[in-house]
C-alpha cells in the first residue's frame, strides 16, 4: 500500500472531530489544515475546489493524485476502503457492512441535522422561538431513544452479537457528546451515556478531539456552563448572507 498522505481540512465541530478521530484510530500519517469559520475560509475558492458546498470537513488524499472527498459519511467510507484493509473499524462481511452503513446514514441524515437545528434554535436564533426549539430538541431526543434501544444488549451500534467498535460509533459519538450544546440532558439515555463515556476514554479519540486547535469546546463547557460561544457570530453572519443571496 502506498504511504498515506492525507490532508484534513477541518474545524473543531462534531463533524470535524469525527474524521480526525478516525484518522487517529487508523494511525496513518495526515496533516491538518485548520479552516477558520469566523473568517469564512470554508468559502474561499481554494476550499471550494475540494468541497463546492463550502462545509467542513473535507480531505485531500495526496497519495492518490490529490483525490478530494467531502461529506463526512463519504470520507468515512473512503478512508475505510483504502486504509482499513484489516477491517479494524469496518466490516468484511457484507451484512455487517450494511449494518454499519445503515447506522452511519442514520447519524448523517437524522441525528446530525436534527441536533444541528436544535443547536441553532437554542443558541443562535436571534429571537427565541419556542416551537422551533421544542420541535428539534424533541426530535433529537427521539433519535437518541432509538440509539438507546439499540444499545440495550449491545456494546456498539453495528456488527453481530454485541457489535464491534466501528465508524458507525465514531460518527455518532461526536454528536452525542455535544448533546449539552443543544440543551439535551442524557439522564433518560443511560446506555447511550455509558457508551459515549467509554468511547471518550480511547486514546485515539482523546487525540482526535483536540484537532485542529488543541482545544475542546465541550470540555470547556463542562468546566464553565457560561463559556463563550465561539460559533455564534459566524453562524448569524452566515444566515444573513444566505438570506441576502437566496431570500425572497
Regions found by a protein language model. Give the residues of each.
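Positions that flank functional sites
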Residues: 37-38, 194, 214-215
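GST-like fold's C-terminal all-alpha helical module
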Residues: 103-201
Amino acid at each position: 500500500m502506498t504511504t498515506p498522505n492525507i490532508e484534513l481540512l477541518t474545524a473543531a465541530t462534531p463533524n470535524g472531530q469525527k474524521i480526525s478521530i478516525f484518522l487517529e484510530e487508523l494511525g496513518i500519517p495526515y496533516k491538518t489544515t485548520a479552516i477558520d469559520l469566523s473568517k469564512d475560509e470554508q468559502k474561499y475558492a481554494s476550499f471550494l475546489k475540494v468541497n463546492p458546498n463550502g462545509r467542513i470537513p473535507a480531505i485531500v488524499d495526496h497519495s492518490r493524485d490529490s483525490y478530494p472527498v467531502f461529506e463526512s459519511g463519504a470520507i468515512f467510507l473512503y478512508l475505510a476502503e483504502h486504509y482499513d484493509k484489516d477491517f479494524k473499524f469496518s466490516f468484511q462481511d457484507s451484512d455487517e457492512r450494511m449494518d454499519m452503513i445503515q447506522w452511519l446514514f442514520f447519524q448523517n441524515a437524522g441525528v446530525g441535522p436534527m441536533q444541528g437545528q436544535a443547536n441553532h434554535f437554542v443558541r443562535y436564533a436571534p429571537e427565541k422561538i419556542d416551537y422551533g426549539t421544542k420541535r428539534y430538541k424533541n426530535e433529537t431526543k427521539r433519535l437518541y431513544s432509538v440509539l438507546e434501544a439499540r444499545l440495550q444488549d449491545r456494546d456498539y451500534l453495528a456488527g453481530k452479537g454485541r457489535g464491534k467498535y466501528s465508524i458507525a460509533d465514531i460518527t455518532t459519538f461526536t454528536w452525542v457528546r455535544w448533546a449539552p450544546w443543544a440543551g439535551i440532558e442524557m439522564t433518560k439515555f443511560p446506555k447511550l451515556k455509558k457508551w459515549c463515556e467509554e468511547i471518550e476514554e480511547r486514546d485515539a479519540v482523546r487525540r482526535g478531539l483536540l484537532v485542529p486547535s488543541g482545544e475542546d469546546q465541550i470540555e470547556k463547557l463542562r468546566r464553565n456552563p457560561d463559556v463563550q460561544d465561539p460559533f455564534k457570530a459566524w453562524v448569524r453572519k452566515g444566515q444573513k448572507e444566505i438570506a441576502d443571496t437566496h431570500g425572497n
